[in-house]
Curated annotation (Swiss-Prot):
Coiled coil: none annotated. Its main location: secreted. Residues 1-30 form the signal peptide. InterPro entries: Cell_Envelope_Struct_Comp, Cu-Rt/internalin_Ig-like, SLH_dom. One of its GO terms (cellular component) is S-layer. Gene3D superfamilies: 2.60.40.1220, AF1782-like. PROSITE patterns: SLH. This is Surface-layer 125 kDa protein. The keyword Nuclease does not apply.
Amino acid sequence: MAKQNKGRKFFAASATAALVASAIVPVASAAQLNDFNKISGYAKEAVQSLVDAGVIQGDANGNFNPLKTISRAEAATIFTNALELEAEGDVNFKDVKADAWYYDAIAATVENGIFEGVSATEFAPNKQLTRSEAAKILVDAFELEGEGDLSEFADASTVKPWAKSYLEIAVANGVIKGSEANGKTNLNPNAPITRQDFAVVFSRTIENVDATPKVDKIEVVDAKTLNVTLSDGTKETVTLEKALEPNKETEVTFKIKDVEYKAKVTYVVTTATAVKSVSATNLKEVVVEFDGTVDKETAEDAANYALKSGKTIKSVSLAADNKTATVTLTDKLNNNKADAISISNVKAGDKEINVKNVEFTAVDNKIPEVTEVKSLGTKAVKVTLSEPVENLSSTNFTLDGKAYFGNVVMGAGNKTVILTPYSSSALSVGDHKLTVSGAKDFAGFVSLNSTHEFKVVEDKEAPTVTEATATLETVTLTFSEDIDMDTVKASNVYWKSGDSKKEASEFERIADNKYKFVFKGSEKTLPTGKVDVYVEDIKDYSDNKIAKDTKVTVTPEIDQTRPEVRKVTALDEKTIKVTFSKTVDGESAIKTGNYTVKDKDDKVVSVDKVTVDSKDSKSVIIDLYSKVSVGENTITIKNVKDATKLNNTMLDYTGKFTRSDKEGPDYEHVINADAKAKKVVLKFDKKMDAASLADYSNYLVKINDTLQTLSEDVATLSVSNDATVVTITFAETIKGDDVVFASGKAISGSGKVNVNELQVMGVKDTSGNVHKKFNGSENKITLSSTSTPLKLAKIDKDYDAKYTAELVDRKTVKVKFSTVINSAAANAFTSESHKIDSIQVNGTSTVTVKFKDEINTNASDLDLKVNLSKLVDIAGNESTNNTPIAIKAGINLLDSVAPVVVGEPVVDKETITFTFSENLTSVSIGEVLSTDFTVTRVSDNKDLAIKDYSVAIANNNQVVITLSDNREVATAYKVTAKNAKLITDDNGDKKNAIADFTKTTATKVEASGTLSLDAAKTNLNNEITKAKDAKATGTEGTAATNQIVGSKDALQVAIDVAELVKNDTAATLQQLTDAKTDLTAAITAYNAAKVEDISSLLVAPDLVLGTTDNGTITGFVAGTGETLKVTSDSAANVEVTDPTGLAVTAKAKGEANILVQVLKGDKVIKTGTVKVTVSE
């Protein structure tokens, strides 16, 4: 077989991997070496390591034969074993038979280029290997390099030429070191190499070429993290792909610097790292198993657990192994239904267990059983059951074959029951039998009859305290035996401040022998450090009283845990209950400003008041001014503190809560169709139960003044519009008489029958709520021959009733009607200003009008009219009113569209100006206004601080951003508005904040300080000239468009200040720049200080009064801080009732012009007139 060299770097890597693996996970020796003591001392370690690694084995007799020479076949076998080589092909040496023991080893080493034949046809497997030949195969196989000096060896001259370079390299690498004889060091290059010497040089070679350090130590940090230390001192943190199972030896594979290692590690867990499992085998308990031990106090704190279903947690107990917590509920779980539990703040060593929504399914399929009956002395017996049961009574028990008579007290968690017989001799010392029957668990399963023997032993030992823990607000005591709960009082436990007793305020039974005592109020909370707690007058069930002056010393743990929101519940439409994880501080908990409630439309529902629940100090009750939505609502809570001494403050919380539908439906519209149609259409404000709407027994009708149940021969019922509408269509005749809608009885023999009243009874919505009018007189609908007219209706409950339409986007207007619209003609809506794209009728009382082009954001350019006669309502009514009704901005159109930026920003020196689509206003000024924007300097991509720019509204519809940052170079700026709140449109009742935008200036703003002093003075002087011109051209007065009186004086003050700076020879560049900025702002303010003409704001035509009438001028509303001044130019005809109001009184026929002025302080800022005509 020809020599094949597959690349010798493989060998070094293989050797490293093989021997490193053997160092970590040693294998058993293949054979016991009986002659190990015959191995020379220098070779024992090398031989032992190769034997341990399974590389070298003893012979059939268990001997290594260390001094025997090694053959080429044996050397090939060592290579193959050490490097775990395998041959892919065959060898064709005539002296290597396929059945020879060395065939595979020779095939593998030849194929991998370690050995070659002595000729093309022979390998010479039994030929002894010389020391020179050993050097050659080791140097070639592992690509050793180096230059050694052989002159130090006495027999260097005997080295054959072909072997010289190999031996030099072997010596340089410390593989071959020579041997001492007669004071000389010899190589013995041509001597056969012994088995022990080959083991030594092979091991030396492996150690030499093994540049990869070995694993020295592995520390398991957690389930997925190892800290690995290598033999060269390298330390690496390794993250495993798969988490280790606690307390189980696991083989892991990992890489460090591209070298793969294997090791066996054990993740030893004593304290918990996670929740291992959650289960519920009954409906009152949830069992949480941790993967290690947890802190008893935090694990037994019910506040640290919450169920997704909202079920209330009563208590938590931790098993003796400190790994299993049993959560007992006040409510019961739903059998065979999934739920989830969240756990927080449970301590485990230096960590905390915090998990969200670990799912489990409650499965209770077993009957309850009695697990123990135990005597509590001669006066009581305790029964323990396998699971919580419903309250038991004396009928569930038989004592010694007789009916039981006595007290029955359920223990903590309803898993135990204490029986105290009335007869003092019933539990005499000795053996007794108790039969228990009919114990029902919370899934409804009932226990079988079972009889239990127990022994009564007289109890004369008083209870003692075996364990006591404390926080600054609580003391938890565990007693040596079950305590008679009738003897436990809050005042039994106290601590002393001097001679003053600080008694507990309340207590909670955690277990039959464990109670928590709560100390409320700053005057009762325990001090820090060690404190003595006294326990008095507590008894066991044998009337043994705890020793007088019993005291325990506790060191209260300071509670630094923040309160958390555990549950939010809508108690009704205007009341919310919030439950926290711990008792809350009353002062912070009742502040209404700490709570923000929003309905499903994201509108704020104002909070009226907040009180701490009198029954639960962990809960607050929130009363609202108005209703929350049926379905999902949002609540945000902040700044609430707990009642601990530290007053820990909660983190801000925002969450959803659901209000179930408990409100009865109401009529949205009642339509009485004309006499010909004989229809009544009822439109409800929510989806109804269709079956109840179609049930004739839910309606009464008065026919000829006689009330009777509606029937099919009187009318038909038709349910439509997704069960929100029912149409009652009356028959044309009843028993041959024509049906008419009229009051009273029809004249006998007239051939008519009067139908005059309909009563709607028990119709229900889909949640089963009966409609609101069911129990009152309002369920009566009077029927008449007059049909209900179609009208426009209020579009939004939160705004004035005048608004009957809404601009919802720049191509859409919605119009609200008094009833459901069935159809609209193509010309029902017309517009001369914008082309209508479509009219959408969707089976509701709202019609949507779509336009082809965009409307101004304030709808100032919209001219829309609706013709009611072109619409047909759900009752089939067609209006007779064919006069188109105008829908106009500021009149009856509600603007819900945000102002938008028009065009690109304009840069002028240090200002950036944005023009908007309509006039703007704001609720703030200056630095606060800047929070509506993010300004980014493009040159270094830095967001400016608020102090580095200011924002102002200019020329009514512009926003000017003035920069004051330090710009090292000329740069563009990117301005972003997102969720702005402070700058809104100035159009109508609804204030729409400016729309989101991001704009980058095309022009760069010059670098700071690039302006010269002379240029700055010139700029300031130009601005002063501009200010003087503005002042000179303006006219102060009270007429519309006049400058507001006093505005010139204000501008002059700003001019004077600017001139002082300009004339100051020591003025700095910054002072000149600031003065110019201030004067620019003053000019802007002056230009805006004009008396506004408010005549256009009239919403009604000029008043017309009779000579005896009083009237009110509409359309004028004074804003905050504004007053009205109203005068008449003809008081003889019309007198102003109150000069600060809008009421007028007619005096005589004629006309009067009423001047209405709006004052801010004593300055007129708005003015308008209205003509009032007095007729006869």
